[in-house]
Amino acid sequence: MGKLIAVLLVWWPFMASSDNWFPVTVQADGVTQPYQPLAKANKIWRICALLPHGKDHYWWGVAWGLSEEASRLGVMLGIYEAGGYDQPDKQRAQLQQCRQKKADAYIIAAIAADGLSPELQQLVQAGIPVIDLINGIDGDNVTSHSVVSFTDMSATALRYILQQSTKPIRLGWFPGPKGAAWVRDADLGVQSLIQNGNITLLNAGYGPPDAFHQAGLTRQFYQDHHAVDFVLANAVAAKAVAQFQLRNPVSQSPIVAYYANPAVIEMLQMQQLAAAVTDSPVLQARIAVDLAVRSLQREKVPKRVSPQIEVLTPANLADFDLSRLLPPDEQWIIRRELLDIPAQD
């Protein structure tokens, strides 16, 4: 962690101010255009944000982006994290807690794509905005999606790998937690490119994106497969594989992460990863807050807004605006209760 702090201290002065993150280029309902958020909300709306967990530093950046944009717009925001992808009941309970608090709108990074369908249907039918953030929610029970396709993310990562080799490759694949919409979509992206016959896919198995589970999958994978040409992995597994390779030089192979978090950025800087794809999660969080406020103010919003996918390498990392991906140095996960409606005299 000390090395990561040193890296961020070098880069942070060059990162964009949180008040100057816009305009940014996005795909809005399939059209490439600049995204310009509101200057301020027209009242102090109360918004509830639900995240799957705070174990992966990826979500630290998301929580920070949510909090910063809510502050900039002048709205109240509660931020809840369920504790893991094995905690769907807790996320459902947190949703009910926000309903009891009469939240005006919801921003949800769902544990499962269909895990909250009945509750979300009730909210949308009542005219309460629901914004799908990052993970993906199935069906029509959302007002808008602030997401990047993980099908495109994993496919972009795999295309990068294919550009590095003209020979058939054995690919180690560490997808992430089974049942999550983003992992399902990432699987689809990989499957879409292995039909050319040049890839032998070796699936390491599914598991929660925490260090304990991904390290276990890594050990088992290398017991079953002593050598591969490339590894394509979720961000937490990418670190687990890199650490395993440092201890076991015979297992060396280039690693590509199909999304990025602070640990991935550190490993890129140290040249322990070949590349990583980023979906700019802080931007997605900021956009989600803006979409929620616009919806509350009866503005027409796009059904889907997606920042551009970018491939980061040790060579181009210094040119990337890290404020799209990372919170400031020493910023941890933000958890915050949604304040109750003030009592009327």
Say what each PLM segment does.
Residues 13-15:
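N-terminal signal peptide c-region/cleavage motif recognized by signal peptidases
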Residues 145-171, 185, 213-215, 260-264, ...:
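Hydrophobic alpha-helical segments within soluble ligand-binding/sensing domains
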Residues 113-152, 163, 261-269, 273-274:
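Flexible loop/hinge segments that line or gate small-molecule binding clefts
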Residues 71-87, 170-173, 191-212:
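Short beta-strand elements in bilobed, periplasmic/extracellular small-molecule ligand-binding domains
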Residues 19-40, 283, 287-345:
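Hinge/cleft segment of the Venus flytrap/periplasmic-binding protein
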Residues 25-37, 45-65, 69, 78-92, ...:
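Extracytoplasmic "Venus flytrap"
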Residues 47, 51, 66, 155-199, ...:
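An alpha-beta-alpha
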